Amino acid sequence: LYGLSGAVVGAVDLVRGIGRLAGLDVIDVPGATGDLDTDYGAKARAAVAALDDHDLVWVHVEAPDEAAHMGDLRAKVRAIERVDAEVLAPILSAPQRPAAMVLPDHHTPLSTRTHADPPVPFVISEPLPGSGGGGAMTFGEADAAATGLLVASGAELMRLFLEATG
């Protein structure tokens, strides 16, 4: 995949299958459930360990999506907070000093409790080339839309990520 060795950490069969088809190693993580009760820390530890022998690790956490399907705002906020504190923070502070890109795989508005197709916000831990680092200061749909940056495809997003992170 893009000339990189990669792995996927996640419990959802669809995600694991996509990873396998993309040539990624699928990492089994005890306690990873694909639901609100997933072991966030175990996913982070597995990702950090995988960085020792992979260039790229895709970590998928289903909990915010599941909370949205339930229409539970508090659970969705809590799941996002846990991703930030228990998954992203440990990965970014790992000895390998990895770059990161964070994004949802799709919208799931609480109001409809179902998937929607607007563009999703994303954040990359390094500034995009030529951007001057002038992206959104917070992470959300409205802030992302205000930047005027619209990425047409996953391949284009990956190209931007690889350019930004060297």
For the regions a language model picked out, list residue spans one by one.
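Feature captures the catalytic ectodomains and active-site-proximal regions of enzymes
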Residues: 1-166
